[in-house]
Amino acid sequence: MLIIETLPLLRQQIRRLRMEGKRVALVPTMGNLHDGHMKLVDEAKARADVVVVSIFVNPMQFDRPEDLARYPRTLQEDCEKLNKRKVDLVFAPSVKEIYPNGTETHTYVDVPGLSTMLEGASRPGHFRGVSTIVSKLFNLVQPDIACFGEKDFQQLALIRKMVADMGFDIEIVGVPIMRAKDGLALSSRNGYLTAEQRKIAPGLYKVLSSIADKLQAGERDLDEIIAIAGQELNEKGFRSDDIQIRDADTLLEISENSKRAVILVAAWLGDARLIDNKLVELA
C-alpha cells in the first residue's frame, strides 16, 4: 500500500494508473476510521481495480474551530486498517499541501440551495467546505467511481448535484448506513461519548424508527410527529437539535406527489452532535 502526502506524487501515480487502464475508486474520509468506513472500502474494491482512500481533516468544512481542534487524528491506526483491507493508495496530505495560501482566499465550490438548507442552515459554510474539498479530490484522483455513506444524506445529495452540474464523469455510490447491534449509526463522533452516554445513544434510532412507523401507518400531521419526537429525545437524555421529514428525492417539504420520505434527525448527547436518517416509502 502506497501512502502519498504530496500533490506531485499523487498525480504521478494517477497518470501511471490511467496508462495501465485501471478503473479507480475513491473513498474520501477525514480519518478516525471505523467499520462504516471499511464498508465503503469494501464497496469500492468490489467495483474497481484500484482503491484510493483520502485522509484529510478539512478545515474549510468546520464551522466551529473547537470541533476542528479536537477532531481525532489517527493516521497510523487508519493506515494499518486500510493495509489489512488491501487498499492500494492512501492520500494523506497536510493542510498546507491542500490550501497553500490558507482557506480564506482559496477558490471554493458552492452548491446553491442544498448548501444552506437543513443541516447547512445550522452549520454555515460546512457544505461549501465539503463540496470544495471533494471537487478538488475528484480533480486530483480522477476516479471512475466514488463511495460515500448514506448516513450523511444531505451531503450525498449535494455531491450528486455537484457532479451533475459540473460535468464530472464519476459514478457516485451511496453505501447504506452501518449500525452497531443496538442500532446506533457508526460515526467518528461516537468516540466523544462517555460510557454512560453510549448506553443512551441508541435511543436516537428508536425515535427515528418511531417516526417511520407513524408515517408508514398513514399519519401525516408532520408538525405533531416532529414535536412528539423532540420531546421523546429530550426525555431520553438528548438535546434535540433538528428533526425534519422531507421528500427523499428533492429534500423539499413533503407534498402529495412525494413517493419517499427521508427522516433527518440531529441531537446533542453531551459534547457529541449525532445525526441519523431513515428512508420511508409513502403509500
From Swiss-Prot:
Q: Which domain of life is it from?
A: Bacteria
Q: Which residues bind ATP?
A: 30-37, 149-152, 186-189
User: Known InterPro entries for this protein?
Assistant: Cyt_trans-like (IPR004821), Pantoate_ligase (IPR003721), Pantoate_ligase_C (IPR042176), Rossmann-like_a/b/a_fold (IPR014729)
Cellular compartment(s): Cytoplasm
State the reactions this protein catalyses: (R)-pantoate + beta-alanine + ATP = (R)-pantothenate + AMP + diphosphate + H(+)
Q: Which CDD domains match?
A: PanC
A single GO CC term for this protein reads:
cytosol
What does the record give as its pathway? Cofactor biosynthesis; (R)-pantothenate biosynthesis; (R)-pantothenate from (R)-pantoate and beta-alanine: step 1/1
Query: What keyword terms does UniProt attach to this protein?
Result: ATP-binding, Cytoplasm, Ligase, Nucleotide-binding, Pantothenate biosynthesis
Give the binding site residues for (R)-pantoate: Q61, Q155
EC number, UniProt record = 6.3.2.1
Instruction: Report the active site residues.
Output: H37
Q: Which Pfam families does this one have? A: Pantoate_ligase
Q: Name one GO biological process term.
A: pantothenate biosynthetic process
Positions of beta-alanine binding: Q61
Main localisation: cytoplasm
MF terms from GO for this chain are: ATP binding; pantoate-beta-alanine ligase activity
Instruction: Respond yes or no to whether keyword Cytoplasm is given for this record.
Output: yes
Q: What else is known?
A: The reaction proceeds by a bi uni uni bi ping pong mechanism.
Function statement: Catalyzes the condensation of pantoate with beta-alanine in an ATP-dependent reaction via a pantoyl-adenylate intermediate.
Subunit field text:
Homodimer.
The protein's name: Pantothenate synthetase
| Species per Swiss-Prot/TrEMBL record | Escherichia coli O81 (strain ED1a)
Q: What is the phylogenetic placement of the source species in the record?
A: Bacteria, Pseudomonadati, Pseudomonadota, Gammaproteobacteria, Enterobacterales
Q: Which gene encodes it?
A: panC
